């Protein structure tokens, strides 16, 4: 491969391609003369569209094929939505850069109603996320929550066709696709705690590829990386995959990390919450200790049920 060429493995959804082009533009701005090529591919998560993600099982539904391309040297980097990135990486690969975070909140989207609380009893709300489901069901047990799969455009079409009264999407994805006008309300973390890494774009590469790591260094956003480190440390201890009823959100306020997390029963009957505040250098340990607290307070039993009896130790 030529020294001035960098290949990006990416999914082919409009949002994934936006993220890949975002990284491409940042790289070319930082390194004039660099030629950046996209290597689009299809992942298992893109193909299995008729089953709720939680039932598909497995981790890395949206990243495995990209990682194989890295290992086989068909690409140099893979660009991911951080909320899709598993807690473990194949040997030789790792997350080396996290770009500046977009708005991490969930979005309430409806053609008829202005807010979650304005929905009449019995309204049908679409989401494929157990994390969103459990928080919705806790706040509004009178709603009917149905699975919703597909890319952002597909989900909006299903709403527009009348299959749902409202759907929940990520604010970041809608903003990136120029669809911010579809957001009726951004849900604060107190109502819908975001997913681990939500709104952040991560870049994975071969750990022994010094040239690529050097090119990527300029794209790393230190504050976002600290926040996502705390969130992912918590998720790692909980052995969380992409599709589990786990929420985690870290903010950096006055030089201190404030980490909030929850584990919920998908039907909203029980949600275990906790939080930590501490120094940025302790981000990883904070995440681990908060996870331990959640496990001891009942999260272990909830996760055992979700994982079919295989709970975190």
From Swiss-Prot:
Record text on cofactor binding: Binds 1 dipyrromethane group covalently.
Keyword Transferase included in the entry's annotation: yes
Positions of modified residues (S-(dipyrrolylmethanemethyl)cysteine): 242
Catalytic reactions of this protein: 4 porphobilinogen + H2O = hydroxymethylbilane + 4 NH4(+)
SUPFAM superfamilies associated with the record: Periplasmic binding protein-like II, Porphobilinogen deaminase (hydroxymethylbilane synthase), C-terminal domain
Keywords for this protein: Porphyrin biosynthesis, Transferase
Domain of life: Bacteria
GO cellular component: cytoplasm
GO molecular function: hydroxymethylbilane synthase activity
Pathway in which the depicted protein is active: Porphyrin-containing compound metabolism; protoporphyrin-IX biosynthesis; coproporphyrinogen-III from 5-aminolevulinate: step 2/4
EC number(s) given by UniProt: 2.5.1.61
GO aspect biological process, one term: protoporphyrinogen IX biosynthetic process
Record has Transferase as a keyword: yes
Cofactor: dipyrromethane
Subunit structure: Monomer.
Function as written in the Swiss-Prot or TrEMBL entry: Tetrapolymerization of the monopyrrole PBG into the hydroxymethylbilane pre-uroporphyrinogen in several discrete steps.
Further remark: The porphobilinogen subunits are added to the dipyrromethane group.
Protein name: Porphobilinogen deaminase
Species: Escherichia coli O45:K1 (strain S88 / ExPEC)
Lineage: Bacteria, Pseudomonadati, Pseudomonadota, Gammaproteobacteria, Enterobacterales
